[in-house]
Each structure stands twice: as C-alpha cells, then as structure tokens.
Amino acid sequence: MRIWSLTRILTFIVIFNFAEAGGECMKKCDSPDMIREIFTRCTMVKRDTQFSENSGHLIPKRSVVADNKCENSLRREIACGQCRDKVKTDGYFYECCTSDSTFKKCQDLLHK
C-alpha cells in the first residue's frame, strides 16, 4: 500500500512539473515579444507587396526571408503549440505554421 501511494505522489509531481513547463512555454509564445520576433526575424513584407484576399483577410502573396533565424522561430512556435493561423502586425497578416505537417509548406512559401 505504501509503494502505491509513493508511486501516485511521484507520478503527480512529474505530471505537474511537465504541465508547468508547458505553461511557461505557451506564455512565452503567446507574448507580444515572441510575435514581434517572428515578424522581425522571419518575414519582411515589402511596402509594394501585392495582397490577395482570403476569408476577408489580406495576405501577402510573396514574402522575403530575413535570415535563417526564421526557421528557429517557427520551430519554437510549433514546439510550444501556441501558434496563430494569422498574426496581425502593423496592419499586415502573416501566415504562421501551426504544425509539423504545414512547416514544409510554410518554408517553401517563405523561400520563394
């Protein structure tokens, strides 16, 4: 009986610590700083970019990669599981990778 109680307590501690770590990560990803980092490091949309309308949102047809830090920022977002479909910054909408399956498609879009 004692071993059973000890096992339950240890399991609770492990799960609780994991949940706490995940919560911190999500908070970090959801922060304006993280969104700003994705905006500045990942995509820079030229002022003369042509926009297409999709479900009432304006989306840049072509994006320019600032540097290879883009990949790391997007991977962090995926790891945190807290990525928006569209991130609005300075009046522009940016497509965001929401899972590993869309990551390749997103990278292809960014590298065009």
UniProtKB/Swiss-Prot annotation:
What keywords were assigned to this record? Disulfide bond, Ion channel impairing toxin, Neurotoxin, Secreted, Signal, Toxin, Voltage-gated sodium channel impairing toxin
Write out the GO MF terms: sodium channel regulator activity; toxin activity
Q: In which tissues is it expressed?
A: Expressed by the venom gland.
List the signal peptide residues. Answer: 1-21
Which cysteines pair up through disulfides? They are C70-C97, C80-C96, C83-C106
In which compartments does the protein localize? Secreted
- GO CC, one annotated term: extracellular region
User: Is this entry keyworded DNA-binding?
Assistant: no
Which segments are removed on maturation as propeptide? 22-65
- The reply on keyword Amino-acid biosynthesis is no
The free-text domain remark for this protein reads: Is exclusively composed of 4 tightly packed alpha helices (no beta strand is present).
Role, per record:
Gating-modifier toxin that inhibits voltage-gated sodium channel with a preference for hNav1.7/SCN9A (IC(50)=25.4 nM) over hNav1.1/SCN1A (IC(50)=4.1 uM), hNav1.2/SCN2A (IC(50)=813 nM), and hNav1.6/SCN8A (IC(50)=15.2 uM). Is an effective analgesic in rodent pain models, since it is several-fold more effective than morphine in a rodent model of formalin-induced pain and is equipotent with morphine in its ability to reduce thermal and acid-induced pain.
The similarity comment for this entry is:
Belongs to the scoloptoxin-03 family.
Other comment: Negative results: does not show effects on sodium channels hNav1.3/SCN3A, hNav1.4/SCN4A, hNav1.5/SCN5A, hNav1.8/SCN10A and potassium channel hKv11.1/KCNH2. The synthetic peptide has been found to be inactive against Nav1.7/SCN9A at concentrations up to 1 uM, in contrast to the isolated natural peptide described in PubMed:24082113. Intraperitoneal injection of this toxin has no effect on blood pressure, heart rate, or motor function (as judged by a swim test) at doses up to 1-10 umol/kg.
Q: What is this protein called?
A: Mu-scoloptoxin(03)-Ssm2a
